[in-house]
Amino acid sequence: MERRTRRVKFTENRTVTNVAATPSNGSPRLVRITVTDPFATDSSSDDDDNNNVTVVPRVKRYVKEIRFCQGESSSSTAARKGKHKEEESVVVEDDVSTSVKPKKYRGVRQRPWGKFAAEIRDPSSRTRIWLGTFVTAEEAAIAYDRAAIHLKGPKALTNFLTPPTPTPVIDLQTVSACDYGRDSRQSLHSPTSVLRFNVNEETEHEIEAIELSPERKSTVIKEEEESSAGLVFPDPYLLPDLSLAGECFWDTEIAPDLLFLDEETKIQSTLLPNTEVSKQGENETEDFEFGLIDDFESSPWDVDHFFDHHHHSFD
């Protein structure tokens, strides 16, 4: 008698669940629930569509396992997980605080061994100038500020120090032009102000007397005597020698002054022979002797008494 073999398609689905509990003595640690379906089908339309096709039977098994873990309960496990998270967050915050980088300053760099180096770039030579190594970043920044102010002046960009204020540039040509225009405006006055003047414009310069020592005075006097020894100053009271003048001194075309009274009377007598003036002139010449002293060639008349006499006569 022949035995036929039958093809069967077998499928198993397993699900595992862990439960945290403390099992008592004699209680199982694993619970397995198995369910087998010998007439399982893939879909409800398999029987209708495949009437003429050989159908392979299908068997499905569903297995569900519950495992009891020896340890704490679920609530204690959750509390422990929350505490662990808090510890991790605290550790992370500490790491962040310790890993904060120091503040960066202009012209300052930190060396691998911890110190700070400062350097600056010279714009004129286009080279870097080494300023030194410092313990703190602030010291290096101050060194950079001083060098920047020295090189760039008011235009320097600094960290702490304040650069000096720029000095104003004075244009001399503009200032001189303004002064000239102001002076010209002040000098323009009306014609009525010609006779007026400003007392403030006149400046008085006082000369201070300098006192010399006796030795200095004696040397100055000697120098003046030596300098005046070779000079001849004319005497203002001495009359010039007219005899040396010659004919050039007297102009023949111009008549000389009438110095003498007798000559005047002679001229009047010649011009007016029949007048009384000529007679009076003759009488006056007879009464008065008008002569000259040989030594000084001057008149011997007493001029002072003559004017006194006429003065009393008028009184």
From Swiss-Prot:
Record-stated family: Belongs to the AP2/ERF transcription factor family. ERF subfamily.
Role, per record: Component of the cytokinin signaling pathway involved in cotyledons, leaves, and embryos development. Probably acts as a transcriptional activator. Binds to the GCC-box pathogenesis-related promoter element. May be involved in the regulation of gene expression by stress factors and by components of stress signal transduction pathways.
InterPro entries recorded: AP2/ERF_dom, AP2/ERF_dom_sf, AP2/ERF_ERF_subfamily, DNA-bd_dom_sf
Pfam families, per database record: AP2
Name the UniProt record assigns to this protein: Ethylene-responsive transcription factor CRF6
Residue ranges of the annotated DNA-binding region, renumbered to this chain: 104-161
Compartments where found: Cytoplasm; Nucleus
MF terms (GO), sorted A to Z: DNA-binding transcription factor activity; transcription cis-regulatory region binding
Main location: cytoplasm
Keyword Cytoplasm: yes
Keyword Metal-binding tagged: no
Factors inducing expression: By cytokinins.
Alphabetized SMART domains for the sequence: AP2
Organism: Arabidopsis thaliana (Mouse-ear cress)
Alphabetical keyword list: Activator, Cytokinin signaling pathway, Cytoplasm, DNA-binding, Ethylene signaling pathway, Nucleus, Transcription, Transcription regulation
One of the GO BP terms on file: ethylene-activated signaling pathway
Gene3D superfamilies per UniProt: AP2/ERF domain
Entry GO CC: cytoplasm; nucleus
